[in-house]
Amino acid sequence: MTWRATVLTLFPEMFPGPLGISLAGKALAARLWALDIRDIRNSATDRHRSVDDTPAGGGPGMVLRADVLARAIDAAETPPGAPLLLMSPRGRPLTQSRVAELAAGPGPLIVCGRFEGVDQRIIDARGLDEISIGDYVLSGGEIAAMALIDACVRLLPGVMGKAESGEDESFSHGLLEYPQYTRPQEFEGRVIPDILLSGDHAKVAGWRRAEAEALTQERRPDLWAARATQNPPERKTNG
């Protein structure tokens, strides 16, 4: 079964966007994955194609209606077990491990929020899993959905040149990725570390590991702390 991303949006013209170029675009053209874009307004029932209304209890902005989204979700042709996601700044953070889970499945249905948000009743009624790509607010969920889809597509079989490419990247082992270098050997007085040119694969691997650990401790102490919790040091015993 081909991995398929189904996207519900008020702006279908935004897609495929960046998903139509580079790795994701080539894989899409090669039918290694599929993209199904659905206009939420097609599920509206009035002549104005209304999809939102004012917030109950008052307040600024508009809220996407539960009944319209329910029709859009129910009309989507998603395989059994497909995750139902809502891109939302209040959702659980998207992690590389979650991306790997999504890439291993049939592909998600993704609701792209707009305005002030989505009626909570559709989230509860359809069991939408709210996903966030960061602690900031975008104009809508489309860009966030593209980021999620791109992260998943890269992990699909046949998309990247080498299977191990995805295994050495940032977050794959709870660490940020080590520094990368290529020719020329010297650039503005800065040279490639000698160990990377030594041909000693064990030493290269050790250097990369040490650099990844140092970067993670410096830039993402939260990741380092979580890693330490998940992988506590082994206790030495006398014997």
UniProtKB/Swiss-Prot annotation:
Annotated segments matching region Disordered: 218-239
An example Gene Ontology biological process: tRNA N1-guanine methylation
Entry-linked SUPFAM superfamilies: alpha/beta knot
Broad class of the protein's primary localization: cytoplasm
Statement: the UniProt record of this protein carries the keyword Transferase: yes
GO molecular function: tRNA (guanine(37)-N1)-methyltransferase activity
Annotated InterPro entries: Alpha/beta_knot_MTases, tRNA_m1G_MeTrfase_C_sf, tRNA_m1G_MeTrfase_TrmD, tRNA_m1G_MTases_N, tRNA_MeTrfase_TRMD/TRM10
Catalytic reactions of this protein: guanosine(37) in tRNA + S-adenosyl-L-methionine = N(1)-methylguanosine(37) in tRNA + S-adenosyl-L-homocysteine + H(+)
Protein name per UniProt: tRNA (guanine-N(1)-)-methyltransferase
Origin species: Nitrobacter winogradskyi (strain ATCC 25391 / DSM 10237 / CIP 104748 / NCIMB 11846 / Nb-255)
Gene name linked to the record: trmD
